[in-house]
Amino acid sequence: MCLTLFTAQADEGMWLPSLIGSRIKDMRSKGFKLSAEDIYSVNKASLKDAVVQFGGGCTGEFLSAEGLLLTNHHCGYGSIQSLSSVEHDYLTYGYWAKSRGEELPVPGLTVSLLVKMEEVTDRLAAGEKAEDIIAAARAEGKGYRASIEQMYYGNQQFLFVYQTYRDVRLVGAPPSSIGKFGGETDNWIWPRHTGDFSIWRVYAGEDNEPAEYSTSNKPYEPKRHFTVSTKGVDEGDFTMIYGFPGNTQEYVISDAVEYVATTSDPMKIALRTQRLDIISAAQAKSAEVRIAYAAIYSGIANSWKKWQGEVLGLNRLRTAEKKRAYEQEFNKWAQSKPEYANLLDEMHKAYDEVIPEYYMRELFSESIATIDAYSFARSLVAAIARAEGEGKTYDVETAHQNFLKNYNREIDQAIARRMVDEFCQRVDPERMPADLKVQISYYGGAEKYVDAMFRSSRLLGKDPITLSDVRGDALVNFARIFDKIYTKSRQYAFRNLSNAPQIEQYYRPYMRALREWDKDRAFYPDANFTLRVAYGTVAGYEYADAEYHHPVSTIDGIMAKDDPNVYDYNIPQVLRDIYAKKDYGRWAQQIYGKKSVPVCFLATNHTSGGNSGSPVINGKGELIGINFDRTWRSTMSDMEFDPSICRNISVDIRYVLFIIDRIGGASYLFDEMTLK
């Protein structure tokens, strides 16, 4: 019985494109019409050539032969913010270039295309050095970067080679009242009505190779771009997502699940709630603060809400309990295998050893390390030490003034008061820094100590500072209190608890054993921000309320939520006018028996962070949407995928086209797209 608990579920999996041939039969049974070579090939143009890593944390896709690129609004949010000001508030009002000359360059923004991936397990086992393999791959082309990534906790190794382009320009973005409609209120929620897209263009040198920004650069010509389907989706239609999911932990044991559900997530949720409340209150008072903290707030809130859904999902599915049952069945089998007989016992011991240290690192990272003044003081002391080690004098005043340019003392002090207090309440008393305990006792509480520190520190004032000022500053003394904790936390700065070496060493044999034992399970490697294929179908769902949730949302839902007095739901007047006249033009559809415009849809694709911006394609390989989210309780799919409730949320490509046309007035962009 327990052996079936984690047998691969329908639509579960994040498959390596180079090995997708093993899944084609199943994909075709669901409606896929293309071949494995159409998805991934190094010998001819394939769909992989139309997909990019966007900005280091998202996915994007080419829409034209002239480098036009589509991703999520939230993926480009920080870049749009960097181009915005009170006078040119592109976050609030959107931006639409009317010509190539109006496309706005974004310093530091890059996109990377996968050139190839290949397994190098045997080469490494034969004695080749990883650095030599990587160096040889990088030398094969201009702008190439390469890495060797571990699959199945090191049982297999794959080389990934990318080409990175550094001239990326903003072409168009809807106002946040469309691109972030629903804001954090609707984040991870269904039904959803967010026009979460932005449009960019990649530029290259004369040879179509990567080049630094130049007015002489030409639009990049991709080997492949997506045809855009305007026919839409119906429930049951095949869907495929091609992107770069960031992090899953499908094979961790029950100890890891329990830590996330009962300790880690609840602590992080509580601390982030307080930071968000402080920032939100300040944003409500000032347009300048609202813009300055827009991306920061979104970054904090995104994981904050995700973790809440993750806890709900893990508890509802009883994931830890099921893992324990699965482990018991595994252990019965393992007793006849000397190499595996004591494996789980050793893993449990390793978790017991590591969890206190890892929790300390997470607590520190979510509290003290979020204080801007602390981070500045610590980095300033480190920079001075480096300079003195080289026989130089560090320019502390220049660093001081650079820090103050974007520093909000009021917000940071409010955050510091709460975070120091929370740290003191949550830290193991035996790990409480003695000097911190003394200071808090002297001032009569954590918040009073913080107020005194901020009041006396010269690092936060406008007057010039010197090296002697730094050495005796109250903030510097505060930073030094945490020196040991900071150093130790860096030793535990792993992607997940289970990646700590003391634990991870056991996962390589554990994964090998699982694949030997559980032969009915379709294994796929955990996501690690490498290119993957996920597939499923358009589908609604029924949850605990016993109400069926349809898989398509419409413009009617936007208008039902519209409220000029609520920031998250205040849509542009032009959209109200279009709706009032039902003037949808070519984008009108009959949906649920009435004339409307589709906005978002649900599907059963297995996704994770990093899949934001991923193309959603139909069985013919045509673009039908842009992935941007999961439903709230689906976030536990990073640890367990359940097809009954796990749904990814995508913005319908027809809504994207509708906004480009009717709101942006940029229908000229259609001339370079392939619409079908």
State where each predicted segment sits.
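Bacterial N-terminal signal peptides
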Residues: M1-T4
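Terminal presequence/propeptide segments associated with secretion/organelle targeting
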Residues: F6-K676
